[in-house]
Structure formats: structure tokens, C-alpha cells
């Protein structure tokens, strides 16, 4: 999928059965592969459709979706099972040579105050080169972005 296709606002794919709906928003996906490794019988990037919601239980699918650090994957339970939980506190994790992963009650607003995104998981650009700012689009790899080693406190 080209960058132009990936970053179209409002493009979303939906994969459903009677128990769960998996939503995928390609503009936020940075292909960490967490879903593929967690549940290959459901998530297979070489298959079409690439999400097969009949490949595992709704509980297993929900667990795998929650491993997506960008929130590109999210789910809705139709079977009365638990919906995505709101994290109790917001955390920000630096990825070496990569984005900031934010988990929590995230609300991103533009300079004019309009809400760009409300989510529980996002990956924010740190390199300054994303064409999907403020979100990471993997441009850090193209430009060779490197983070500095943490300063030693002498201990």
C-alpha cells in the first residue's frame, strides 16, 4: 500500500463475525507485527482479507489487538464480552530510534483546537519527518533517525 493510500483520512477496514468486529485504520499502522506474531491464524498480511476473525475466539482476538501499539487495530465486542479497557494512567514509552508509544486517555488536538484523534494507543513521530504528523509513519527508518544514549548519572 502506498503512503498516499495509507494516509487518506477516514479509510478504515472492518472485519466481523457474530462475536467481534476488528477495525483497522491503515493510516496509523506502522507494521510492528505484534498482531501477526500473537495470532497468525487470524492476522496474515499475505492473505486477503488479511484479518480472519473466524480464526480464533473473540477473547484471543481482543488480546492480540491490544498488542497493537499504534491503535491502528481496535475492536468492538458483539457477544457481551469486555470492550477495550481505558488504561488507568497514561504512559509514554520511547522506542529506541523510533516513535513514542502513548497509552492512556489520549486526545490530540490541532493548532486550531479541532480534535485530530481520540484513542487509547498512539505512536507519535519523534524524528520530525513523518508525512502523517503527529503520528509515526516509519520515516525515521528512511532518514536514519537515531536516539542519543541515555546520560549516565555516574553510578
Q: What are the functions of these language-model segments?
A:
Residues 77-91, 147-153:
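Polybasic, low-complexity binding patches
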Residues 2-4, 53-78, 90-107:
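Short Fe-S-cluster ligation motifs
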Residues 9-30, 43-63, 78-83, 113-124:
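Ferredoxin-like iron-sulfur electron-transfer modules
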Residues 29, 68, 125-127, 136:
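Short cysteine-rich clusters marking metal-coordination/redox-active sites
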Residues 131-155:
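Short histidine
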Residues 34-47, 65-79, 133-142:
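Iron-sulfur cluster-binding cysteine motifs and their immediate structural context
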Residues 33-45, 101-114:
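A short, structured beta-strand/loop element
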Residues 1-19, 150-155:
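Iron-sulfur (Fe-S) cluster-binding modules
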Amino acid at each position: 500500500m502506498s503512503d498516499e493510500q495509507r494516509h487518506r483520512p477516514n479509510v478504515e477496514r472492518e472485519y466481523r463475525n457474530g462475536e467481534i468486529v476488528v477495525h483497522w485504520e491503515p493510516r496509523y499502522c506502522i507494521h510492528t507485527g505484534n498482531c501477526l506474531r500473537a495470532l497468525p491464524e487470524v492476522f496474515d498480511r499475505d492473505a486477503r482479507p488479511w484479518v480472519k476473525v473466524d480464526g480464533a475466539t473473540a477473547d484471543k482476538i481482543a488480546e492480540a489487538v491490544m498488542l497493537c501499539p499504534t491503535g491502528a487495530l481496535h475492536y468492538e465486542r458483539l457477544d457481551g464480552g469486555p470492550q477495550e479497557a481505558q488504561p488507568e494512567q497514561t504512559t509514554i514509552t520511547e522506542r529506541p530510534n523510533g516513535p513514542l508509544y502513548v497509552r492512556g486517555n489520549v486526545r490530540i488536538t490541532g493548532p486550531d483546537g479541532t480534535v485530530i484523534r481520540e484513542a487509547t494507543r498512539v505512536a507519535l513521530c519523534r524524528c520530525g519527518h513523518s508525512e502523517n504528523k503527529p503520528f509515526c509513519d516509519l520515516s525515521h527508518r528512511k532518514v536514519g533517525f537515531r536516539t542519543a544514549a541515555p546520560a549516565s548519572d555516574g553510578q
